[in-house]
């Protein structure tokens, strides 16, 4: 099991209900205390740089409520974004996961895991993109850890 730190948590039981073709951003505020259940935030690494020997792994999984789509084609893609400043327009895609079909029966379990690649800047955030039928219910957890 991974060690979770509030400062490196993007989403804590955050809703991913989104219309077809829509997106949910993990949040726009930087950690200032414990992240509330249902909330999301931007992670501030303190400075840019490639942490050789201290690599971080992004882990994203369905939360307590299964992710359910409005049809069999409902799919969710995880996008890790990075920026020098915490301004929406500054964030650029760093890693894109394959789209995971969540379907109408519901999805529980891991959606995506990857090492944060070289080139990450000071601020990181996660965006959940829907590439199929609407997502009608579900929560998600996403965080950084040193575990793989």
Q: Where do the language-model regions lie?
A:
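Surface-exposed, low-hydrophobicity beta-strand/loop segments enriched in small/polar/acidic residues
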Residues: 1-148
